[in-house]
Amino acid sequence: MHLEDNWINAVLSKFDNDELFREAISIASHSLYQALQKRPLKNPTQVCRSLQNYINRMASRATPFGLFSFVTAGYWDEETRGSLDLTKVYRRARPDMEWIYALVKKFYRENSDFSALLVQSNSLVDLKGDRLFLKYFRFIKDKKIQTPKTISLYANRLVITIFEMAKSRLSIDQLWEKLLEVLPNLNKEKTFEVIKKLLSHQILLPGILPSLLSDSPFKELMKFLPNAVWMNELETKLSDYQSTSLGSGELSLQNLRKSMDAVVPIQSPLHVDASYKGTPIYLSNEILLKLQQAVTFLWKISASRSSQFTSLEAYRKKFIEKFGLHRIVPLKELLSEEKGLGSFLTYPQIDEKSVFDKFSQQWEKCLNKKWQESMLNHQKEIVLTEEWLNSLFELVEEELPDPCKALSSFDLFFKIQAQSIEEINRGNYQLYLSDCTWSGGSTFGRFWDLFNPEIQHELSKLAKAEKHLEKSAKVVEVSYWPSHVRNANVSVHPCLREYSLEIDNKDNSILGLEDLYIGTTHERFYITLKDGKEEILARSGNVLSYIQAPESIRLIREITLSRHLLLYPFYWAGLEEKAVFLPRVRMGLCILSPAKWNLDASSFLKDSLDIIKVKFLAWAEQWKLPDRFLMTEGDQHLLLTSKHPAHLNEIATRLKRGESLQLMEEITSEWLKSESGSHSGEFVVPFIKNSIYPYPENTRTPQAFETVKSRWMLPGSQWMYIKVYLSEEQENNFLLNKFIPFIEHLNEFISINDWFFVRYQDPERHLRFRLRIEDIHYYGLILSWLHPIGIQWMEQGLIKKIMLDSYEREVERYGGEDVMDAVESLFCVDSLAVTGLLKYFEKKEDTLETVCHILSIVSFLNGFGLDLQTKIDVLGNARQDQKLLKGFREYKNQLLKLIPALEDPNQPEEGICSVVNKFAMIRIPAQNQFLSKAQHIENSRLLEIYSHMIHMHCNRLGCDNSQETRLRLFCEHALKCCLKTSHIS
């Protein structure tokens, strides 16, 4: 108890005797500040533990946090130099964004002249039929208020008209006048109540909500508010507070808070940062060189990381399946459950391997080996070299990552571990690379106004240099008010890019969500505009995590990031959270990963706090945990010591709660000094990619968005779409012996012009039949016959169920609306040709299925009159894995004889080539019709269309995706052998 009293008294003494500390606590947690003012304390241990955590956090990391730290800009020079003069540290105070948001809400709620207020539609709202949906809300943190996950409002004609008219900002008075033009009998009072309801549900937003792409959102807001006494008073008190010297601002701060609370009372009305305007700090060019080398090393090993965008990749595969490679889809339509693919966040995390899969496996294997050796030899450090890393790539015969695919820019965080500046200049230092962002300069965005014009100019140059690396794309600054509006403090900065997308300030924004379209290539998604000419890159000049963004913003941010090979901090892969001890990892003078310890909480759950402390100290001694260490959680670091009773209590409490701990060695930084002593410094360097490595030029064919009226064929159109669910084993039997006879029976009474089928799984296995009906009045007759025969099929155990559905024609995939009828006619005759072949296979048990399938593919391509090289090019479009060639030798000789024989008219009538050609002849008229209508399509595009047709042909033959890939590769290789041996001219 005596020890506990000692540390509590020490913490309280610090608070009572240090005005700057009290001021910093008031800014960080005013509720804690108020609790400490009331003596005696109600719960001294709990209150002082909270206070101790702030002290620990201040000593742990130089993260800008109120008055616990400050920011400044430095320079590179021949040697390191500099010291701190704390009299040159200045505050910058501005209204917290949460307070600004609350002020706007109050103004709209209490304004007597409601009709003068500006409003705008919320671009995140979706209109579906007669309902409005909103899934992203802005809120002020309040435990009493529960934020809804989704709002759904009935939208009558008035609501829809209001929503559409307010897509451009206008006053409620102007909105009323426009409404009267189309709805002249409106009641004004009732209409205004509707507008108020839409504002309260965030369907409409206040038109004065300030832009976050600004030096001062508060000044922007003041332009819209009527002049009031409190404004001048607030401006004066802000100025007074900022001008007080450090250590004498507590009273001024409290007066300022009272004034702000009188206007809008919230928990944190003020946002304070500190900046240093003394003599700059200079770091040596040698340090920069070491950082560049370490970054190159880190980027190479980042190739071992599997993609973090695996849900996005699953979404992309579904996009290709539904829309193909030649269609762009409006962003908002894509995210719609009804029109597109729905939310990409609901798609599974697929097991997507790294692009550098061999290296990834080798890296993890070698890292494991080095860890085992370090444990065996009791080593506290592992040293890696560039030569060793390059040898791993050589060992697995993989090329080094392409620097053109690297990020255009990024910020690197690092610390310098050294005893003094003199030691740094002697080369006695180490650099700890702690973190990075994926956009250069983003760390500095929120501090823009704290830098001098020279530094601001350098940051502007960085944005321009980044644009030069992306010559074929528009780089767009994306901005939005986050759901927890206090986080908007991180997002305040001017726009340094030519284009912007502000979803809450459309009048200030060059682009809107409705302007964006999504397409995909074989490798990745891309964002474009309606004309499809230029790619759009969605970037952000701040460090607010895009994970918190509205889904539409998150999607475009992930699409932009997924085009790059990203940079990651060092990661121990499977060992990161499992190994009890991980040694320090170093490359030259750069610490890539400090020593780490993992402590599993499961063995402490039943123990008392006192026993947990004893067990922890024993564990710490066994695993040689230093006296001072960091407890980490994400990017939060807390400096602790095993000798401090409050720290031990914090550790024991967490373990008792079942929280496993990750501990890390402290990287000390004592060389940066002032008259008050040593200071912890964390440095951030923005990097821009070398201009000799621009991002690869976009080779995709521009796709303009087309609204195709004939894309959808609903029940009742000329196409009847029937799905028959059944087991895979029954498919051919049902197709040949049940469904085709059913169609033949129908044709005795009515005219079914054409039909075709596709095999599918979504996830249940089924056959899809599309029937083109001459007279839609036959629909009822067909269904009346389908019902009894369907019941019979179900009773026989042949099928599970039958469904009618809407047929979405894949217009872009097959060359456009002009050729779609010809494509469907070809599908119909191909269905007849394939079913003929399948019947032949049924009778000939000795037929080699693989050979027949390959010959059928070749005969399909022969029908277009393609030469040998063009056939090879079509099959090569599929980008197959060469490993699948295994087994080709078994068929090689037979294929080299049979493929040329397909074009020999003198083949035996019962021979396999004659049989394949017999059914191929059914397709020839339809193929010729397609060619006559497709003359306007360029050759490279035609090859892709042929490839898609081959995919559908293989599907009808009964091949799944892996079988099709293998068939294509065998076929391509056989054709290359034929070309080589001149069997076909």
Where are these regions (language model features)?
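Extended, charge-rich low-complexity regions and/or helical-solenoid scaffolds
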Residues: M587-P763, D775, K801-D805, L837-K844
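Type-3 copper protein
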Residues: M1-P95, R157, E189-R486, R524-Y526, ...
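Short acidic, hydrophobic short linear motifs in intrinsically disordered regions
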Residues: R169-L180
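Long, contiguous binding/interaction regions
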Residues: Y695-H766, R770-S985
